[in-house]
């Protein structure tokens, strides 16, 4: 793997990273990220960190196939509210041109439980956090045992998140895969897959223009528009929900969702109003196509609830593959403003 490192790259090993699963490599990895080198390579091995890695503008962090970044036992309690595996350095003025490519990002949630949800400096359990970033790429990563969201982004423009495996062996509440907050636009989220029963244990992809940003895992996010996003190639055997669109008054516009495969316990596509008043929602120009999903047994919730206001939404080539009649495929609140064209069919019984 060493031969793949471009000449301009620095290896974290040069800065003292050990990767033996015991040594605290935070300082060495941070020193590498602070070195001014545009590309930092992290070799194979288990790199234990005890506080957030900060990545600045114009930096690529490239991890070997066998590289693991793991939050050390008890590190979150010590680090408190601003604890992630990695985040962009400047969330006040913003960052640009950041790439994280490769590696296993292990939140070690069994040894790093979340803090109290509304306490000011409590750990929220998020894996990676990118807020106010222009030109962001996260690719080829395995997200493991994050206490809440695997990857969250807010106020991002021109972003690509691709080839992400959600590989949780410890199931926790609020384990969203890719969680997108307000003021995010021009994004591609693709080839996101999940391994095993109960994974992920919340929305695989959430586009939440409105939310409760006082909760610890949302701290630092804003309420605001989300627009021009492509979500494609999303697969799981036993997702909680595949894709959520959540809006109260903030607009969600120009969204394409395609190629969803597998099974879900709750919803395939969730447009319910959550805690917001009846009749809310500001969603328009949504295309959903090429869906082949099963409702996994266990509850009677509809695969696609629509209780938010939505205009110009099209669902086409949606095939439901299970034969359970307890759960409806589509449930629309007739008392609100919904403009939806639908092409949904049940697969033939074998």
Predicted regions and their residues:
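Extracellular/periplasmic carbohydrate-active domains that bind, remodel
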Residues: 1-350
């Amino acid at each position: 793997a060493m031969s793949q490192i471009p000449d301009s790259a620095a290896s974290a090993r040069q800065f003292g990273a050990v990767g033996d699963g015991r040594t605290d490599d935070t300082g060495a990895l941070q020193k590498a990220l602070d070195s001014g080198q545009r590309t930092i390579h992290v070799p194979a091995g288990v790199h234990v960190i005890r506080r957030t890695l900060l990545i600045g503008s114009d930096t690529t962090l490239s991890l070997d196939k066998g590289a693991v970044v793991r939050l050390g036992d008890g590190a979150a309690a010590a680090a408190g509210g601003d604890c992630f595996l990695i985040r962009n350095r400047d969330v006040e003025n913003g960052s640009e041109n950041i790439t994280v490519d490769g590696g296993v990002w292990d939140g070690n949630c069994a040894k790093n439980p979340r803090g109290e949800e509304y306490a000011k400096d409590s750990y929220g359990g998020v894996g990676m956090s990118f807020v106010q970033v222009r030109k962001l790429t996260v690719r080829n990563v395995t997200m493991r045992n994050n206490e809440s969201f695997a990857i969250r982004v807010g106020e991002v423009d021109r972003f690509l998140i691709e080839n992400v495996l959600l590989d949780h062996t410890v199931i926790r509440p609020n384990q969203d895969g890719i969680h997108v907050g307000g003021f995010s636009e021009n994004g591609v989220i693709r080839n996101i897959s999940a391994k095993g029963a109960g994974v992920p244990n919340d929305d695989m992809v959430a586009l939440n223009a409105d939310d409760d940003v006082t909760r610890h895992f949302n701290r630092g996010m804003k309420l605001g528009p989300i627009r021009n996003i492509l979500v494609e190639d999303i697969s799981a055997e036993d997702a909680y929900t595949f894709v959520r669109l959540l809006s109260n008054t903030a607009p969600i516009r120009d969204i394409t969702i395609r190629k969803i495969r597998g099974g879900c316990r709750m919803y395939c596509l969730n447009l319910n109003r959550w805690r917001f008043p009846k009749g809310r929602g500001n969603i328009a120009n949504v295309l959903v196509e090429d869906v082949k999903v099963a409702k996994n047994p266990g509850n009677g919730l509809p695969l696609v609830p629509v209780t938010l206001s939505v205009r110009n939404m099209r669902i086409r080539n949606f095939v439901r593959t299970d034969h359970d009649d307890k759960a409806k495929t589509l449930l629309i609140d007739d008392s609100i403003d919904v403009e939806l064209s639908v092409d949904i069919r049940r697969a033939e019984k074998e």
